[in-house]
Design a protein with these regions (language model features):
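Bacterial N-terminal signal peptides
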Residues: 12-23
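N-terminal secretory signal peptides that target proteins for export/translocation
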Residues: 1-8
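Intrinsically disordered, low-complexity, compositionally biased regions/tails
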Residues: 8-14, 246
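Active-site/ligand-binding surface loops and adjacent short beta/alpha elements
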Residues: 140-198
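N-terminal non-cleavable signal-anchor helices
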Residues: 23-25, 172
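Acidic, serine/threonine-rich low-complexity disordered tracts
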Residues: 27-139, 183-284
């Protein structure tokens, strides 16, 4: 009999990997750029799993890249000469794939207007074993409306699912939500509310700033701040028990260096392993 993890096991892990890794795209701090993650940057993490006698077994690789790209045609005037493109790519590895005979791969591409920092479009590819889904979110921030569409490339006759949702204020996908947190004053004891769209629904996610401390990281011993996003619970994005914590450097770069997700299945530790400098010409 083959062991296969349920989908509700994979989704929280994928969210954790994305949330942590995208945060860290804030490494480069050159003052000549509008944001510390410009003009381009790549970040590499490793995810590990622990339960009982299993201690920090490799389960996933993930890479995240922030780049500039030329503006595409969108509703309303462009306020910048370029768009920001955030890309997150996550795949299973090693023990996890062999134990469960199961492969997952997720890729998200998010396009933002950099001056107003509003999301324009999100594309997603989600592979879990033989299951494959492609989805897209089109954001109309000015009119408070988004359209989510999902299709099964292996079964095109079924057609695409579509959900239209209205919202007030600023709404983000999971990538841009983390970038938004980096721009906020992270004062211990405060709670920051972030509105996130996931699978056609809109969630209000409270993010608590828990504490500051020193931590050993790939960057050395640095001061970090701990954030606890409220993703779990009956009204949360994940409707089962769990606790997610993310540690970011407390300086202006806000580099996420570690994260931990505790679930009924075990504990997942995510660790920054490498920051890759990438060169990219300025847009014309």
């Amino acid at each position: 009999m083959k062991l296969r993890p349920p989908r509700r096991f994979c989704r929280p892990l994928l969210f954790l990997l994305l949330a942590l890794a995208v945060c860290v795209s804030a490494q480069s701090g050159a003052a000549k750029y509008a944001h510390p993650f410009e003009p381009s940057e790549e970040l590499i993490y490793v995810g590990e799993f622990s339960r009982l006698l299993l201690k920090r077994v490799d389960v996933a690789d993930f890479h995240f890249i922030a780049t500039r790209e030329p503006h595409q045609k969108v509703d309303g005037p462009a306020t910048s000469a370029y768009a920001l493109k955030l890309t997150g790519d996550i795949s299973s590895r090693g023990f996890f794939s062999r134990l469960f005979n199961f492969h997952f791969h997720e890729r998200i591409e998010s396009t933002l207007e950099p001056v107003s920092f509003t999301v324009q479009k999100t594309k997603r590819i989600d592979e879990q074993g033989k299951r494959l889904r492609e989805s897209e979110i089109l954001f109309d921030q000015a009119n408070g409306k988004l359209v989510w569409m999902e299709r099964d490339p292996n079964n095109p006759a079924v057609g695409a699912r579509s959900i239209t949702t209205t919202f007030t204020g600023q709404v983000y996908d999971i990538l841009s939500a983390i970038y938004f947190l980096r721009t906020q004053p992270l004062e211990v004891g405060k709670t920051i509310a972030v509105t996130i769209s996931e699978s056609g629904r809109v969630y209000r996610v409270p993010v608590k700033v828990i504490e500051k401390k020193r931590m050993k990281t790939v960057l050395g011993h640095v001061e970090v701040v701990r954030l606890d996003p409220g993703l779990y619970g009956p009204d949360g994005m994940v409707r089962e028990p769990g606790q997610l914590s993310i540690w970011l450097t407390s300086d202006s770069k806000r580099i996420p260096v570690a994260a931990r997700l505790k679930t009924e299945y075990g504990t997942f530790d995510i660790t920054l392993r490498k920051i890759v400098a990438r060169s990219q010409p300025k847009p014309a």
